[in-house]
Regions:
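Short, loop-centered acidic/histidine patches that primarily coordinate divalent metals
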Residues: 115-121, 236-238, 272
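Alpha-helix boundary/capping and short turn/kink residues
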Residues: 24, 36-40, 120-123, 135-139, ...
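Compositionally biased low-complexity segments at domain edges in trafficked proteins
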Residues: 263-282
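Residue-level signal for inorganic ion chemistry
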Residues: 31, 114, 267
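Aromatic-anchored, charged helix-turn/loop surface patch used as a conserved interaction hotspot
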Residues: 1-10, 16-21, 26-102, 152-160, ...
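Beta-strand-dominated extracellular/periplasmic modules and repeats
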Residues: 166-260, 266
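C-terminal non-catalytic interaction appendages of large macromolecular assemblies
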Residues: 89-161
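A general structural signal for short secondary-structure boundary/capping elements
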Residues: 114, 160-167, 278-282
Length: 282
C-alpha cells in the first residue's frame, strides 16, 4: 500500500491500522488529528513527537498490553510470538523455558511484559537482554520499553505501507562499536547501557548487546533525537571476558560524551584486558 492509498481509507480503517502499529489509544487519537498525512516523513515525525511528548506512562503501558509475551512457552513453541519476534524460531527447549521464567520474573517486578524490538535478534540474545534489564529500575525500564515500542512502530509502518518511501530514515543518532584489540576482532555479546542524568542520577534510557560485528545499530529508534546534553555509555567488559575465562583489569568501562545538535554520534570502544581507548567516530 502507498501512503496515497492509505490516505483514501476511512478514518475508522486508518485508525485501526495505526492501532495495529502502536496499541495506545492516545497515540492513535493524536495521530489521527493529522490524517490524511502529507508525507511518510511527516507521519514518522508525528509518530515520534506524539509518542515522546504527548503520551504518558499510562499510554505507554497500554501499548505494551497489545504485545504477546516473548517468554511465553506456548506462544514461543506454537507461533514464535509474532513477526517481530522471529529470532526465537531457532530457540532450544531450554532457552524457551529460560525465556518463560525470566519473562514471568520481569512482569512480576515491573508490572508489564518485556518489550523488545526482536527483529534480527536470536533467542539467546533476547534472553541475555531480558536478564540484564531485570536489574533496572521501573523508571529505567519504562524509558527503554517505550523506545523499543517506537522501533516496533516504525517497522510496522514499513510493513503496512510496503510501497511507501522510507529512504529518509537514518540510523540511530547514537551508535557504538567495540573492538577487542587483544585479538583484533569485534567484541560481540557485550551488554551496553546508554544513560542520561535525571534529577542528578544516572538512569539507563537505552540498552542492547553488541552483535557479531561488535555493533548495536539500533540503540535508539530511528528519528529519535536526544536533546543536547551529557550522556554516558556503560560497557559490561567484565562479563565479556569472564565468558572467555580471561581476567580483566577493567570489569566495567564508562564513557561520558556530549551531544551538541541532531548530528549522528558514534562512540566506539577499543578494549583489551589491560587497557581501553575511545574517540569520536563517524
Amino acid at each position: 500500500m502507498t501512503l496515497s492509498a492509505y490516505n483514501l481509507l476511512s478514518k475508522e480503517q486508518a485508525a485501526k491500522h495505526l492501532m495495529d502499529c502502536c496499541g495506545s489509544t492516545q497515540w492513535v487519537s493524536q495521530m489521527m488529528a493529522y490524517f490524511p498525512f502529507e508525507s511518510e516523513k511527516q507521519m514518522v515525525h508525528l509518530a515520534t513527537s506524539v509518542w515522546y511528548e504527548q503520551c504518558d506512562e499510562s499510554d505507554w503501558r497500554e501499548s505494551f498490553t497489545h504485545h504477546p509475551k516473548i517468554g511465553d512457552v506456548k506462544s514461543l513453541t506454537e507461533k514464535f510470538a509474532g513477526k517481530e519476534q522471529a529470532g526465537v524460531a531457532v530457540a532450544t527447549a531450554a532457552t524457551i523455558e529460560a525465556l518463560a521464567k525470566a519473562n514471568t520474573d520481569y512482569e512480576n517486578k515491573f508490572g508489564f511484559i518485556f518489550i523488545v524490538c526482536a527483529t534480527g535478534k536470536s533467542a539467546t540474545e533476547m534472553l541475555q537482554l531480558l536478564l540484564n534489564r531485570l536489574q533496572n529500575t521501573i523508571a529505567e525500564e519504562l524509558n527503554i520499553a517505550m523506545g523499543e515500542q517506537q522501533k516496533i512502530t516504525l517497522i510496522r509502518f514499513k510493513k503496512l505501507l510496503t510501497e511507501a518511501d522510507f529512504a529518509f530514515l537514518k540510523v540511530s543518532q547514537i551508535t557504538t562499536h567495540v573492538l577487542d584489540t587483544a585479538v583484533g576482532l569485534p567484541g560481540k555479546n557485550i551488554a551496553i547501557k546508554m544513560q542520561s542524568q535525571q534529577n542528578g542520577i544516572w538512569q539507563t534510557i537505552a540498552q542492547g548487546i553488541t552483535n557479531i560485528d561488535g555493533r548495536i545499530p539500533d540503540l535508539l529508534p530511528q528519528e529519535r533525537i536526544l536533546k543536547p546534553d551529557t550522556y554516558k555509555m556503560v560497557f559490561d567488559t567484565g562479563s565479556y571476558y569472564k565468558q572467555q575465562n580471561i581476567k580483566t583489569f577493567y570489569p566495567m568501562v564508562e564513557i561520558m560524551f556530549n551531544t551538541f545538535d541532531d548530528a549522528h554520534y558514534h562512540v566506539p570502544l577499543l578494549v583489551n584486558p589491560f587497557g581501553y581507548s575511545t574517540y569520536r567516530g563517524s
